[in-house]
Amino acid sequence: MSNKCDVVVVGGGISGMAAAKLLHDSGLNVVVLEARDRVGGRTYTLRNQKVKYVDLGGSYVGPTQNRILRLAKELGLETYKVNEVERLIHHVKGKSYPFRGPFPPVWNPITYLDHNNFWRTMDDMGREIPSDAPWKAPLAEEWDNMTMKELVDKLCWTESAKQLATLFVNLCVTAETHEVSALWFLWYVKQCGGTTRIISTTNGGQERKFVGGSGQVSERIMDLLGDRVKLERPVIYIDQTRENVLVETLNHEMYEAKYVISAIPPTLGMKIHFNPPLPMMRNQMITRVPLGSVIKCIVYYKEPFWRKKDYCGTMIIDGEEAPVAYTLDDTKPEGNYAAIMGFILAHKARKLARLTKEERLKKLCELYAKVLGSPEALEPVHYEEKNWCEEQYSGGCYTTYFPPGILTQYGRVLRQPVDRIYFAGTETATHWSGYMEGAVEAGERAAREILHAMGKIPEDEIWQSEPESVDVPAQPITTTFLERHLPSVPGLLRLIGLTTIFSATALGFLAHKRGLLVRV
């Protein structure tokens, strides 16, 4: 006995739920099969007395993320701004330097040129890469065969710029610079709107959070869909050899549908058996695309003591000894439940996972006390953390990364349907892929691909642009004339070299004219 419907959606994260909602609103009979005992996927809002609510997974939204903002608003959710009123801190070589703005200031002029050149070159290279087809970039092969470590070493002359560039990669994609393709990372930053947009709180990707937590997006769609959402149903088998697609779950339920949307991370396709087998390129692609490593940590305090010292809670922390490289204030908008959120990133997540929860908390508090210069940081009232590396139905967080050589070879199959299976998930997005915004884009696009396949909408309606959010408008990202035209360090050296040669030649000519050069 099988359950019949129009579309089975595999995965009840934001992408799968957004797809299911659109199909349901279009009058189709849809079933969502979710492996876990909850919806939300890589978003997860924990609720208890100590925290009220806390996002242990994806949390941040900001300007230009118009789809998630529209969907959340439709579901009755509101946003609030992450605190960035006071000063940020850059902690480097054991010292804390307060600053304002998205990037830490640099005082050494040579180092400044190096930093400026790195950010500018990242954005310049990104402009060469098509958001919807990075493998079509003019230098795609060359950039894809290079790791971000190689690119950083090539672009940065100073240790200071190399360290900040490395932290930037670790923070953006929860992976090491030697693990990721330069082409893929350049694409990733580009499709988030560039270096400033992706890294910024104000006017950037971390500007806001949802009041009540981001888990509500998926939960409220589940409320709308009712018993069409089936929890604790890991999909193990998809059969496309008959008139309808058959989908089997681990508890041996059968679902029969005209179409399927796979809204899980690409590599989790490995947990499903396919009949007929997947095409060669997809079969290999899903074995080659891992997810990043991160432990998200939230330390709670009696009050936001850092604000009294004119610090907003954002800390950018350099150095191997520091467990956390980046923090943000996670205090509730009302000013209660004071907290600092920090990420343990990439290899540090693997290393520090060996410790106990209590040992990690101790390390974090000691670090925050040092960076903030506040012994109050040693007196937490509560602690929550989530190690996403141990989640068998995510495989890691925030998102899938592409090692060198994979994107140009296999990238084009990411969203390519396999007969009646269509692919969603934030990884398949073309704008803010890796974020909740990308999840919504991908889910709704996959849903419209099916509506088109059923003859309900024309092909040119599959991809739709999104009007700008009226509540969260974007300010343009601007650069100064100097930032655009200052030379790089090698450029400066060449300039000095040319000037020296020119000066020496001119002096020699002058000396010769005045008879000051004696011929031997």
Curated annotation (Swiss-Prot):
Residues spanning the membrane: 490-516
All ranges on the Cytoplasmic side of the membrane: 2-489
Primary subcellular site in the record, as a coarse category: mitochondrion
One cellular-component annotation, GO: mitochondrion
Coiled-coil ranges per UniProt: none
Modified residues (N-acetylserine): 2
Modified residues (S-8alpha-FAD cysteine): 397
Keyword Cell membrane: no
Intervals, Mitochondrial intermembrane compartment: 517-520
Catalytic activity: a secondary aliphatic amine + O2 + H2O = a primary amine + an aldehyde + H2O2; (R)-adrenaline + O2 + H2O = (R)-3,4-dihydroxymandelaldehyde + methylamine + H2O2; a primary methyl amine + O2 + H2O = an aldehyde + H2O2 + NH4(+); benzylamine + O2 + H2O = benzaldehyde + H2O2 + NH4(+)
Subcellular location: Mitochondrion outer membrane
EC number: 1.4.3.21, 1.4.3.4
N6-acetyllysine carried by residues: 52
The UniProt record lists the keyword Membrane: yes
A GO molecular-function descriptor: flavin adenine dinucleotide binding
Pfam families in UniProt: Amino_oxidase (PF01593)
Entry superkingdom: Eukaryota
Membrane topology: Single-pass type IV membrane protein
InterPro entries: Amino_oxidase, FAD/NAD-bd_sf, Flavin_amine_oxidase, Flavin_MAO
Site (Important for catalytic activity): 156, 365, 382
Similarity comment: Belongs to the flavin monoamine oxidase family.
Role noted for this protein: Catalyzes the oxidative deamination of primary and some secondary amines such as neurotransmitters, and exogenous amines including the tertiary amine, neurotoxin 1-methyl-4-phenyl-1,2,3,6-tetrahydropyridine (MPTP), with concomitant reduction of oxygen to hydrogen peroxide and participates in the metabolism of neuroactive and vasoactive amines in the central nervous system and peripheral tissues. Preferentially degrades benzylamine and phenylethylamine.
Oligomer status and interactors: Monomer, homo- or heterodimer (containing two subunits of similar size). Each subunit contains a covalently bound flavin. Enzymatically active as monomer.
Name of this chain's protein: Amine oxidase [flavin-containing] B
Organism: Pongo abelii
Gene: MAOB
